[in-house]
Amino acid sequence: MSNSISVSFNDEPPGSIDPVRVENFISEVLKDLNLKNWDISLLFCDDAFIQNLNKQYRDIDSPTDVLSFEQGDEYFDEAGETRFMAGDIVISLDSLSFNAEEFNVDINEELKRLIVHGILHLNGMDHSDNSPEQEMLKFQEELLMQYKNMEIYRV
């Protein structure tokens, strides 16, 4: 059985993001992490939307680039196969653009970074701050090297 990946947009999707490319990227990351039978969703939104979520669930009244909502529930599908409801990732397109400019990186690279970051959180990894010495962030950057040539954002 394979992973189930859903990509959606809070507003009209920008032409620069191809949901199929994003789904393929997520599928590759899950495969490389040996995560099977996962159900995962990714929602693209704006800063206002993610700020509301950040305030509601983390009591932080400001936008952020990515949020992960881990569900962690196992269930059986119609065929009796065990599946894992991993959870949801929310990415702000406003913060994506800001980060790419602020950190002087390609927007495609930053999008992959935010997606991988969300997946690692859904897989139980965490970090106490954003310093590059954090184990999760080191692992994230090592993992991203594998996808250096994979384009998911059309410029």
Swiss-Prot record:
Which SUPFAM superfamilies would you find in this protein's record? Metalloproteases ('zincins'), catalytic domain
Q: Name one GO molecular function term.
A: RNA endonuclease activity
Q: Where does Zn(2+) bind?
A: H117, H121, H127
Cofactor (UniProt):
Zn(2+)
Note the InterPro entries from the entry: MetalPrtase_cat_dom_sf_prd, YbeY, YbeY_CS
Co-factor binding details: Binds 1 zinc ion.
| BP GO annotations | rRNA processing
Please provide the record's keywords in A-Z order: Cytoplasm, Endonuclease, Hydrolase, Metal-binding, Nuclease, Ribosome biogenesis, rRNA processing, Zinc
Q: Where in the cell is it found?
A: Cytoplasm
Give the range the annotation lists for the signal sequence: none
- Its Enzyme Commission number(s) read 3.1.-.-
**Gene Ontology cellular-component terms listed:** cytoplasm
Family per similarity comment: Belongs to the endoribonuclease YbeY family.
Q: What does this protein do?
A: Single strand-specific metallo-endoribonuclease involved in late-stage 70S ribosome quality control and in maturation of the 3' terminus of the 16S rRNA.
Supply the name of the protein: Endoribonuclease YbeY
List the source organism: Treponema denticola (strain ATCC 35405 / DSM 14222 / CIP 103919 / JCM 8153 / KCTC 15104)
